[in-house]
Amino acid sequence: MITTLTSDGLDACVSLYVETFNAPPWNESWNVQDAAQRLGDFFATPRAHGVCSLNSHGDVLGFALGHLERSGVDDHFLLQEMCVRTSMQGKGHGTLLLEALADHLGQVRHWYLLTARDSDASAFYERIGFRPAGRMGVFVRP
């Protein structure tokens, strides 16, 4: 079952986030406090929208979270985080999450996100219609 993400469901998403992104292929080093801060900040962003997938016992299988931004006369959606339980990946849960989020957002045509190049995640996003932005690049400052 896919539902709208609420503040009540954020703690379960935090646990899933830590579990998923600390495991291969990401191998990051998240703790609960930092992940809660990150997801809480995203959730508190004006015009934030998210969905989560639950199994029949109410356990979170995945979630997607981002926010709308105005660009000219259109709204664009920045998908800030998406996470699917490792054991459930490759079974359509990510696609269903993004379809539900698209239905929730209505007529928003432009979405964007950041992910690792040449990764399973980037391959997933390309399979469902995302493409690398030809003119855009990511710049970082040390």
Language-model features: locations:
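A short beta-loop-alpha structural element at the N-terminal edge
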Residues: 1-15
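Conserved GNAT-fold acetyl-CoA-binding loop/helix
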Residues: 18-40, 48
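Conserved beta-strand in the GNAT
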Residues: 50-52, 59-69, 78, 83
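A conserved beta-turn-beta hairpin within the catalytic core of GNAT-like acetyltransferases
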Residues: 69-79, 89, 133
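Conserved acetyl-CoA pyrophosphate-binding loop and the N-cap/start of the following alpha-helix
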Residues: 87-100
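Short hydrophobic clusters on alpha-helical segments that form packing/core surfaces
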Residues: 101-105, 121
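Conserved acetyl-CoA-binding loop of GNAT-fold acetyltransferases
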Residues: 102, 126-135
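Conserved GNAT acetyl-CoA-binding A-motif
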Residues: 105-116
